[in-house]
Amino acid sequence: MRALFYKDGKLFTDNNFLNPVSDNNPAYEVLQHVKIPTHLTDVVVYGQTWEEALTRLIFVGSDSKGRRQYFYGKMHVQNRNAKRDRIFVRVYNVMKRINCFINKNIKKSSTDSNYQLAVFMLMETMFFIRFGKMKYLKENETVGLLTLKNKHIEISPDKIVIKFVGKDKVSHEFVVHKSNRLYKPLLKLTDDSSPEEFLFNKLSERKVYECIKQFGIRIKDLRTYGVNYTFLYNFWTNVKSISPLPSPKKLIALTIKQTAEVVGHTPSISKRAYMATTILEMVKDKNFLDVVSKTTFDEFLSIVVDHVKSSTDG
């Protein structure tokens, strides 16, 4: 697809707006079907027919903070939402196997690669931190789980604090209390005398990918699952603890905000980029709140998974 530059309803082949696109270009048909927000700047529209645009990226623009915003066709969004539903169910179905792997290897006396993989997976399934590719650390000093260093771990007698700066320069902080099962394994891995050494110094991207492959999922699937799991836990907790309950709309907005704070991004990104829409539609139902109030979290999670699964099967 060719990138065309947009200004005042017109398209150009160059970003200086000197060479206008022909009026019969199919991209103009696309513009008749979409509304480009007026606050966006540096807008690029992709040359394609309206039929093609339904399943593809349509245009990109910068918001007031300079962040690039991406707008996709309706069918692309529907397919993406359905994919999130499938990922949520798929990861839920393998969590027992993942926990078995963790339990088996975290008991090792040595800190070999399998032990480190167990600690890595335990941290990922607790905090759902971004993977942390080495190239991003080198390019812009973005830290993720794999690229954590000893200097990012602060140890005290009753807790461990994990602090680092991740994607988009967002500061992250996770607390591991002494009573948590992660405390001792993390303490065992950390070497205060080598602050610049990687925490997972016996792992590589390849080793982590090979490990996660045995469960039939991708490492990024755990984060998608984690955002939805965290949302559901917060939603369940809010229904149980807030009195009187706000409207479903306000309750969902509050829960998305809480979830975004935990996983380290904005509420809009949580909703747009990670949330399974089937889950959001399900919790909008006022009658469903009565069900939530009478269940344990595990029962609630099982009900949600069954509903999402039936939606994807249908």
UniProtKB/Swiss-Prot annotation:
Pfam families: Topoisom_I, VirDNA-topo-I_N
Positions of the catalytic residues: Y274
Regulation: induction: Expressed in the late phase of the viral replicative cycle.
Keywords recorded for this protein, A-Z: DNA-binding, Isomerase, Late protein, Topoisomerase, Virion
The family this protein is said to belong to: Belongs to the type IB topoisomerase family.
Its job: Releases the supercoiling and torsional tension of DNA introduced during the DNA replication and transcription by transiently cleaving and rejoining one strand of the DNA duplex. Introduces a single-strand break via transesterification at the specific target site 5'-[CT]CCTTp site in duplex DNA. The scissile phosphodiester is attacked by the catalytic tyrosine of the enzyme, resulting in the formation of a DNA-(3'-phosphotyrosyl)-enzyme intermediate and the expulsion of a 5'-OH DNA strand. The free DNA strand then undergoes passage around the unbroken strand thus removing DNA supercoils.
Name assigned to this protein: DNA topoisomerase 1
Organism: Variola virus (isolate Human/India/Ind3/1967)
